Amino acid sequence: FVELARKGFYDGLKFHRHVPGFVIQGGCPNTRDLTPEEVVKKAGNPFAGLGTGGPGYSIKEEFSTNPNNKHLDGSLAMARSQDPNSAGSQFYLCLGAQPMLDSGYTVFGQTIDGMDVIGQLRVGDVIESVEIENAAE
């Protein structure tokens, strides 16, 4: 995530999934060339290709080796397919604590300020840029 963010991978992508009280998800490169309105229109169609894109590689899961893997309100975590080792570029922010995800999805960040902004994010909203602070290398 940090490497992709520093390369500008996320710049201009749109959030493509919002489940109130659960998560807001982004990071799918298939949203890059779509307008926000097109993303909103396609978001309800499971065959539209949203949520299926990635950076061309996948990341091994880390939730099984991280005792602090807790999905709290504002946690930043890697989205993936059914394969635990399939995470790539897609991420989600928790909209409330989601402990049922702790044993299956890797948390790698925590929102420390701006939860009011996260709560207002919706499908089609544009990721202008991602700024990394205090990242472990």
Pin down the residues of each PLM region.
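Cyclophilin-like peptidyl-prolyl cis-trans isomerases
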Residues: V2-E137
